[in-house]
Design a protein with these regions (language model features):
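Membrane-water interface of transmembrane alpha-helices in multipass transporters/channels
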Residues: 5-7
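Interdomain coupling/hinge region of P-loop NTPase helicase/AAA+ cores
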Residues: 1-3
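Soluble catalytic regions of large protease machineries
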Residues: 10-15, 21-177
């Protein structure tokens, strides 16, 4: 049986997905949008699907930064539209994915802002547990900085383009896809 969303959920979801879409549209280097929808499916109330123009074997640091920004788009849109106290749990999966990607950047890919590239090639959390507390702390700090950077870029973009966010959210609310 399909889930029927209440009007406020529809608007929240339209703003959330509109946020992902807006960031994808306005961020140079972000993958193009294939589809944006607020039709619930499974445990998701909506979705923005991006598809790269070509087959992708590896990603640049810039491409990963774009992905992080798009992941933050939904949560930042909710915060901008409804205030920090009214952000929903709908962004939980986005935040988990962003955190995992940022951790991989620091631990596996060597995409650290630190001059010391000593922490790379770590594949699993077990590898991290074997590190000293200072190194683990440095990884956490760099992950946090990477995520904060994505949040800041996304919030700046969203604030500067709030009318476009409203247009996208209204279109999603009206047309659903």
């Amino acid at each position: 049986k399909s889930y029927v969303m209440r009007p406020q959920e529809i608007w929240n979801t339209a703003c959330h997905e509109g946020g992902h879409a807006l960031v994808a549209l306005l961020t140079p280097g972000a993958d193009p949008i294939h589809k944006a929808t607020i039709i619930p499916r499974g445990r998701s109330l909506g979705h923005v699907l991006q598809l790269p123009e070509n087959d992708v074997v590896s990603l640049t640091r810039k491409q990963i930064r774009c992905k992080l920004d798009v992941m933050f788009g939904g949560r930042v849109a909710e915060e901008l539209m409804f205030g920090k106290d009214n952000v929903t749990t709908g962004a939980t999966n986005d935040m988990q994915q962003a955190t995992n990607l940022a951790r991989r950047c620091v631990m596996q890919f060597g995409f650290s802002d630190s001059e010391d590239q000593g922490v790379m090639g770590l594949m699993y959390e077990d590898d991290v547990r074997r590190l000293g507390p200072e190194t683990r702390e440095r990884i956490d700090k760099e992950v946090k900085e990477m995520l904060q950077g994505a949040y800041n870029r996304t919030m700046r973009l969203m604030r500067n383009n709030k009318p476009k966010l409203l247009t996208l959210a209204n279109a999603l609310k009206e047309y659903e896809t």
